[in-house]
């Protein structure tokens, strides 16, 4: 998985475990696609300090995932749901409307 995408997904799961400043910087970098220099200017700090904070947060998020495996479980669940829905559609001739209804209900589990 591409690092940037993986970190963004980990942020969705674990951002509440970061400090407010860490969340803010990570959101600016990964969600808003600001450069290190732009984030440093907004935070009145050095580019190097922002770089270090992001790298530290990346490691922290990866550490949370290695211990809790929430992203892995979520991806496995998503794959299972998609396979189940495809099987349902093929074997039981489920209409597109019903397919979408089942999909929505399963995703909300």
Curated annotation (Swiss-Prot):
Pfam family, one: UPF0122
Membrane-spanning ranges: none
InterPro entries (UniProt xref): RNA_pol_sigma_r3/r4-like (IPR013324), UPF0122 (IPR007394), UPF0122_fam_protein (IPR054831), WH-like_DNA-bd_sf (IPR036388)
PANTHER family: UPF0122 PROTEIN CBO2450/CLC_2298 (PTHR40083), UPF0122 PROTEIN YLXM (PTHR40083:SF1)
Function in brief: Might take part in the signal recognition particle (SRP) pathway. This is inferred from the conservation of its genetic proximity to ftsY/ffh. May be a regulatory protein.
Family note: Belongs to the UPF0122 family.
HAMAP family: UPF0122
Protein name per its UniProtKB record: UPF0122 protein CLH_1195
Protein species of origin: Clostridium botulinum (strain Alaska E43 / Type E3)
